[in-house]
UniProtKB/Swiss-Prot annotation:
GO cellular component terms attached to this protein's record: endoplasmic reticulum; Golgi apparatus; Golgi membrane; plasma membrane
Catalytic activity line of the entry: L-cysteinyl-[protein] + hexadecanoyl-CoA = S-hexadecanoyl-L-cysteinyl-[protein] + CoA
Function text: Palmitoyltransferase that catalyzes the addition of palmitate onto various protein substrates. Palmitoylates sex steroid hormone receptors, including ESR1, PGR and AR, thereby regulating their targeting to the plasma membrane. This affects rapid intracellular signaling by sex hormones via ERK and AKT kinases and the generation of cAMP, but does not affect that mediated by their nuclear receptor. Palmitoylates FYN, regulates its localization in hair follicles and plays a key role in epidermal homeostasis and hair follicle differentiation.
Active site: 120
UniProt protein name: Palmitoyltransferase ZDHHC21
UniProt-listed InterPro entries: Palmitoyltrfase_DHHC, PFA4/ZDH16/20/ERF2-like
Stored PROSITE patterns: DHHC
Main enzyme class: transferase
Domain-level remarks: The DHHC domain is required for palmitoyltransferase activity.
Domain DHHC: 90-140
Molecular function via GO: protein-cysteine S-palmitoyltransferase activity
UniProt family annotation: Belongs to the DHHC palmitoyltransferase family.
Compartments where found: Golgi apparatus membrane; Golgi apparatus, cis-Golgi network membrane; Cell membrane
Amino acid sequence: MGLRIHFVVDPHGWCCMGLIVFVWLYNFFLIPKIVLFPHYEEGHIPGILIIIFYGIAMFCLVALVRASITDPGRLPENPKIPHGEREFWELCNKCNLMRPKRSHHCSRCGHCVRRMDHHCPWINNCVGEDNHWLFLQLCFYTELLTCYALMFSFCHYYYFLPLKKRNLDLFVVRHELAIMRLAAFMGITMLVGITGLFYTQLIGIITDTTSIEKMSNCCEEISRPRKPWQQTFSEVFGTRWKILWFIPFRRRQPLRVPYHFANHV
């Protein structure tokens, strides 16, 4: 199965994603420059903490890029419907194409997406069956990176010994306080937002319910048998190997269940 690149032409989405990239670049370059490397050179922290910071940052960036360009599960114009599954398909009243039940038509993208959770402007893409796992990784690594940066910002002023060597000729050193205050503001704002989003995503997977289904209150009308959380997460990530749930570099295998997901909207 070839790699399907999905690119949404949406200026609003570009602006939102550009803001996320700016915050990532701000932390990626300035936190090590102001905090990590100076304290490492004076023996206050081990080098492994710097490696961990860059590792988390790279995992976060890979998850962001892949979540934004991966096809979320767009349906082809002439899908081949297995004969035994025709009863689980329906006609979309917006694009007049057949789709599996639990699919949704995205008005911003202009097409139907399999098991669509929501359209996220922060990645300028829909979150659907084929990229939901990457969106979860993005939430996880963004929260981890934000906590890591905030922790070292706090330690820089209130825990670590004062730096003995400071090159005041450098712009980042002369304006360190303003830079760190902005980093703390962005970090706290990001942490609050991403924590709420990540929590709702986890609850949705555990209960096998998409965000669109929650908003439409359709779940109250459906007698949906509860699945074990391991099964629901395995369906999203495409593997039962839990260690692979944290790796954004791999290829996700298609779900080994029918297109329609037996419990549907």
